[in-house]
């Protein structure tokens, strides 16, 4: 009898024994020389179980299944290094610490793989955007040229999920989109803005000597701006009530500077000119 026939007969016998004990074996491959032990108390440890099952053969490994917190789930597996009769161990009624153990063949579950289904990738709809304005430029945005992209296969298949089409933006792009700029405006609607230049003009005036001497020429710089249209300089008017031009006259008698307002200065200037005119008329009449 070949090894395959022996394993098949052993699996059939183990399944019959499991059905007789009232539980159904899961689908999978029966592990040789390994026994499933259920009904393990929390107080039991692996050393005690190893010492107890040495009567059936040389115990290779004892594995108690625990949860994430390390608490025993109440079952485990015992592997023997020698050839043992697993059916004999399963049929025997074993009680440990006054508690009956549930024995059965150890079965390795078969990992079922679902054939991966390719995910359908749809290319995005070409996007055209045109914005026109009479007084502005026209921008036309074309869709970017996309290179062929390899279809991605879903790594984690879900058997119960229906086929789905995922629309996403492709990653592999050869070159970005192009923009065409075409200026559209009439010639008479163009307007140009230039910075306003600043010019400084020197304003010449004469300060009168209080002793009746010759007038003293002086220069006062005045800033003027030129309009953007290129016309004449814009005059800057100063209200006499809000701002007065102070003229500093040197007094040789008292050796200090006296300050007079614009109104007093103009009044004294008119009186001085009238006096000079009268003196000139008198000299001519003589």
UniProtKB/Swiss-Prot annotation:
A GO BP annotation: positive regulation of translational initiation
TM segment ranges: none
Gene, per the UniProt record: dazl-a
UniProt protein name: Deleted in azoospermia-like-A
GO CC annotations, alphabetized: cytoplasm; mitochondrial cloud; pole plasm
GO molecular function: mRNA 3'-UTR binding; RNA binding; translation activator activity
UniProt similarity note: Belongs to the RRM DAZ family.
Lineage top rank: taxon: Eukaryota
Species the sequence originates in: Xenopus laevis (African clawed frog)
Main location as per UniProt: cytoplasm
Keyword Hydrolase included in the entry's annotation: no
One family name in Pfam for this protein: RRM_1
Expression (tissue specificity): Germ-line specific. Oocyte mRNA expression is first restricted to the granulo-fibrillar material (GFM) of the mitochondrial cloud and then to the oocyte germ plasm at the vegetal cortex. Remains an mRNA component of the germ plasm until the neurula stage. In 2-8 cell embryos, expressed in the germ plasm matrix between germinal granules and mitochondria. Expressed in primordial germ cells (PGCs) later in embryogenesis. In addition to the ovaries of adult females, expressed in the testis of adult and juvenile males in spermatogonia and spermatocytes.
SUPFAM superfamilies, sorted: RNA-binding domain, RBD
């Amino acid at each position: 009898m070949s090894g395959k026939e022996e394993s098949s007969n052993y699996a059939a016998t183990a399944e019959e024994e499991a059905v007789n004990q009232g539980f159904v074996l899961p689908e999978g491959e029966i592990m040789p020389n390994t026994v499933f032990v259920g009904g393990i108390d929390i107080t039991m440890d692996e050393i005690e179980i190893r010492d107890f099952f040495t009567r059936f053969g040389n115990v290779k490994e004892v594995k108690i299944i625990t949860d994430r917190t390390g608490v025993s789930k109440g079952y485990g597996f015992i592997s023997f290094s020698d050839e043992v009769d697993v059916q004999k161990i399963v049929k025997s009624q074993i009680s440990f610490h006054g508690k009956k153990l549930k024995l059965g063949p150890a079965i390795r579950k078969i990992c079922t793989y679902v054939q991966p289904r390719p995910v359908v990738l749809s290319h995005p709809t070409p996007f055209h955007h045109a914005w026109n304005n009479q007084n502005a430029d026209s921008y036309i945005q074309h869709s970017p040229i996309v290179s062929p992209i390899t279809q991605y296969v879903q790594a984690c298949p879900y058997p119960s999920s229906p086929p789905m089409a995922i629309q996403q933006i492709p990653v592999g792009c050869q070159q970005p989109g192009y923009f065409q700029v075409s200026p559209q405006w009439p010639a008479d609607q163009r307007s140009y803005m230039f910075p306003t230049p600043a010019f400084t003009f020197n304003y010449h005036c004469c300060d009168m000597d209080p002793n009746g001497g010759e007038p003293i020429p002086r220069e006062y710089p005045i800033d003027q701006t030129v309009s953007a249209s290129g016309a004449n300089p814009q005059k800057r008017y100063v209200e006499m009530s809000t701002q007065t031009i102070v003229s500093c006259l040197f007094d040789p008698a008292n050796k200090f500077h006296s300050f007079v307002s614009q109104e007093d200065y103009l009044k004294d200037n008119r009186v001085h000119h009238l006096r000079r005119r009268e003196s000139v008329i008198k000299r001519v009449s003589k």
